[in-house]
């Protein structure tokens, strides 16, 4: 069978049309659910929106990293599934538009603790006083339980980070020290710049890949290889900037030099998981090359396993370093996540995100069983969402989930279905004239 005729055409297929329709339906249902959330609790709405935004961003960034990594290391096994990776990386374009609501309306609710007083909405002042009282109670509790550790530091940090610009308090010196970085203009410029860089690299990699379908020239591969190395350096910087601005700045008193790589580890897990779901589903329905072996499934399962272990390693390392240093500014971040219902979530996250997936993906048989791989891929996507929820929501709430949060999950599912389908319509789902395709199809695990 010819390498160029061994898969179905995606564009115009029944599956493509169905995916587009389901995606549209899920988007509509998700918007309705999000509207209910906005009407019931504006503050919670914006924090749940940020969770959804960072989740969708992680899918696109992780796929873009895998795309560049393939060229950088000269991988063969991933060539037959490259168009799927390109389709997921293409989510970065519509995700960029999801940042606009945060810029226009969400910042005053999410980052009011470092936005100057004149930029606040009126209702923010009452919230600051409430946050101050909650934080003071926590400080008093931990001062009493470990006065030698916290008493001196607590005197200098009487207010929670979100009280930095409260209506009745002086500007916070810690926030003021970070003022050149924590400002709306820099937030806009740096984050818009990050998206422009990511999208520019994405178009470079994808366009060269698609141009190769016309004449099979090796020059297109070489162009991407040359660009992949500098991309890695730029990617590390821009991803860290995004993680700091969107999530770490929710609590500007807290800082961690490992936070960027912590989010990066999550993007690798989530992107590997969504790629596993899409690749297996498309292959089983005849849209990827028929000669592709289950060894490709094994590689995807290995990526999920390895990068999830990497996530656990980074998570534990960050916790251990903060626990060992025992600095008030750092430890309070974990204390907030061990208060109220968040203590249960914290322990559950360890089990749900690491322990169970570790044993479920440990054996070779598990990594070559399509149905089990898809199940674990969905599991890890849910674990990544929980991780983001655990990072973001405790910054303002002592309780966790709300029923209206389902609207954000439905919207995210529809978003992926609709825009992935739209993004891969313009080309073959297999890079039919890539010189490495045949080697990729012959790939076997030894």
Regions found by a protein language model. Give the residues of each.
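Hydrophobic cores of alpha-helical transmembrane segments in multi-pass inner/ER membrane proteins
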Residues: 59-66, 97-98, 191-202, 265-280, ...
């Amino acid at each position: 069978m010819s390498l160029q005729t061994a898969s179905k055409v995606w564009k115009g297929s029944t599956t493509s049309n169905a995916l587009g329709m389901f995606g549209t339906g899920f988007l509509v249902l998700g918007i309705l659910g999000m509207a209910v959330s906005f009407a019931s609790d504006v503050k919670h709405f914006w924090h749940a929106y940020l969770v959804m935004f960072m989740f969708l961003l992680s899918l696109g960034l992780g796929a873009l990293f895998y795309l560049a990594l393939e060229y950088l290391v000269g991988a063969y096994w991933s060539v037959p599934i490259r168009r799927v990776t390109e389709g997921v990386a293409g989510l970065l374009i519509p995700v960029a538009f999801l940042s606009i609501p945060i810029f226009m309306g969400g910042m005053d609710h999410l980052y009011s603790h470092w936005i100057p007083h004149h930029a606040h909405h009126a209702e923010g002042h009452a919230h600051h006083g409430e946050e101050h009282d909650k934080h003071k109670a926590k400080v008093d509790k931990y001062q009493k339980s470990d006065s030698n550790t916290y008493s001196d530091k607590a005197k200098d940090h009487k207010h929670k980070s979100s009280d930095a610009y409260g209506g009745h308090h002086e500007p916070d010196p810690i926030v003021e020290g970070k003022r050149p970085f924590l400002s709306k203009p820099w937030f806009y410029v740096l984050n818009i710049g990050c998206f422009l860089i990511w999208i520019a690299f994405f178009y470079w990699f994808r366009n060269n890949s698609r141009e190769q379908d016309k004449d099979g020239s090796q020059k297109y591969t070489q162009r991407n290889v040359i660009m992949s190395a500098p991309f890695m350096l730029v990617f590390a910087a821009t991803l860290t900037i995004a993680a700091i601005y969107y999530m770490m700045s929710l609590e500007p008193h807290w800082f961690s030099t490992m936070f960027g790589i912590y989010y990066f580890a999550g993007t690798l897990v989530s992107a590997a998981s969504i790629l596993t779901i899409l690749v297996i589903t498309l292959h089983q329905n005849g849209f990827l090359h028929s000669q592709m072996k289950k060894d490709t499934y094994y590689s995807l399962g290995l990526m999920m396993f390895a990068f999830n272990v990497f996530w656990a390693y980074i998570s534990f390392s960050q916790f251990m370093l903060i626990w060992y240093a025992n600095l008030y500014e750092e430890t309070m971040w974990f204390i907030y996540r061990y208060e109220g219902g968040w203590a249960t979530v914290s322990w559950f996250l360890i089990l749900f995100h690491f322990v169970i997936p570790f044993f479920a993906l440990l054996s070779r048989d598990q990594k070559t069983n399509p149905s089990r791989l898809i199940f674990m891929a969905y599991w890890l996507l849910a674990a990544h969402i929980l991780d983001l929820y655990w990072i973001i929501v405790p910054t303002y709430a002592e309780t966790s989930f709300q029923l209206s949060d389902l609207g954000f999950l439905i919207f995210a599912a529809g978003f992926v279905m609709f825009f992935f389908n739209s993004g891969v319509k313009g080309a073959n789902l297999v890079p039919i004239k890539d010189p490495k395709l045949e080697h990729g199809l012959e790939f076997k695990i030894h």
